[in-house]
Each structure stands twice: as C-alpha cells, then as structure tokens.
Amino acid sequence: MKTRPLSLRTSVLMIAFFLTVSMSASTNAEDLPSLKGKKVLLVYGGWKGHEPEQCVGILLPWLKAEGAVVDTFSTLAPYADQKYMESIDLVIQIFTMSKITAEQEKGLLTAIRNGAGIAGWHGGLGDAFRENTEYQFMVGGQWVAHPGGIIDYEVTVTDKKDPVTKGLANFKMHSEQYYMHVDPNVKVLATTAYSGKHASWIEGATMPVVWKKTYGKGRVFYTSLGHVAADFNVPQALEILKRGIRWSAGSKYEPTEQWVKPVY
C-alpha cells in the first residue's frame, strides 16, 4: 500500500496546531510562579511499584533546568529537622504505603501550615501514610480503590480558567483509575467518570483527578495520575504535574487563593 503525501493545506494545519499547543503551554507557564531560586525538597521512596526512582529521573532534570535548588532524599528524615524545613519553599513527595514517625509528620505538617507548598501525585502523596488522618486532611484525599486495575479511561478538564489546566483538552489514560475519599471543598481542576464495568454500583460516578487547596498558609497540589513513570508520556499528564509544582512553589510568595467551594 502506498502512503499518500500530505497536502500543503494539511501540513500547514498540522504545523499551526502544534504551534498553538506550544504557545498555549508557554503562555500558561508565564501565569505561574517561577521555580528559579526556589528551594525544593524532593522526597522519594516507599512502594517500588510506583517507580519512585524513575519518576525522580523525569522531574529532577526539569526542576534544575527551571532554576530550582533541589535536595533529594530517599528517606523521610528531613521532615523532622525543623530548621531545615523552615528553609524549604516546596516539598515534592512520592512515598507510597509507608510509615511516618510522629516527629516527621509534625515537621512536615508544620512546614506546610507555615507556608511551604507541597505537590505530589498518585499514591506517592494520596496513599502514603494510611494511619495518619491529619496528613490526609492536609492532602485533601486518600486512595481507596482502583476498579479494574490498569484500564482505559478519560480525564475531563473541568476548570478551563485555572493556570494549571488552562488551554488543555480532555485526554485518555491507560492506567489505574483512582477512586478516592476526597474533601468536598477542594478546588477541582479535572475529573474522571466510571463506566461501571468493574464495579457496577459506581457507574456514572464522577471523581476528582486533579485538585488544589491550602493547609494553613501552604499550597497543596495533587494529581491522581502517574501510577508508573511511563504514564507521564501522556503530555497533558506531565504538563499538569509541572504546572501544579510551579503553582505550589509560589506558596510563600503569592497571595492566598480562595479555594473552598462547598458542594453541599
């Protein structure tokens, strides 16, 4: 079978599309705080199935290219160092299904309440310390199920104005579709709906996928996407995470946003 060459009109349209996407991402990035000079604590570990090391390999080069000053730790020990935590602008955490000491939890939560930002994804933030309800209060949600395991599903961008999701279209994922217990007051930026194929009683249910909130003075960003590092090959998934990180990094320097929007 011979492949027909693209017409000039088709080629021009394709170029225009990719330029528009590129310009949109650039424009929205300008609406978010810069990472230049920000002190970032990148903490990774916990369950290996979520590929923490590989995810660090994706984020670390980008963070450094953005001008962030990054400390990486494969332990939660820094959380207990009060003086160190006071110097941090942003915590990025991927530490699934782990234990945190009372001293470490207090150090982390105090830092966020006092103005440091925190950002994370999937189980690394949303299923980290199952016994610690104050931590879950800070995050705004907790994983409880992923019906069907690895499946195809769609993510709907519901907030078209927020700089974290502005300009992004709906997109498809082949991964775990998280079902979570979520604070009904978080500012939801993207959602997903369940087919009912794997749990008939939730057919048509809608669940937040991406949200933002505050805890004390600190900005909190969460996305349930990113079961494995390859999930960030989906451009929108990676772009949302990067924008969410930048938003959170402005926690000590930007005005507090109004995020509480009761649904009841």
Q: Residues of each region from the PLM?
A:
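N-terminal secretory signal peptides that target proteins for export/translocation
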Residues: M1-L8
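Bacterial N-terminal signal peptides
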Residues: S11-S22
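Boundary at the C-terminal end of the N-terminal hydrophobic targeting segment
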Residues: A25-A29
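Extracellular ligand-binding/catalytic regions of CAZymes and related secreted enzymes
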Residues: E30-K39, A65-A68, K83-E86, G196-M207, ...
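Helical hinge/lid and interdomain linker segments adjacent to catalytic or ligand-binding clefts
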Residues: E30-S34, L41-V43, W47-G126
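Short, solvent-exposed loop/turn segments at secondary-structure junctions
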Residues: K48, S98, L125-G126, A193-G196, ...
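Catalytic beta-strand/loop cores that center a nucleophilic Ser/Cys/Thr
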Residues: L63-K64, V144-G216
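A glycine-rich, often tryptophan-bearing local segment used as a flexible ligand/cofactor-contacting loop or short
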Residues: S98-G167
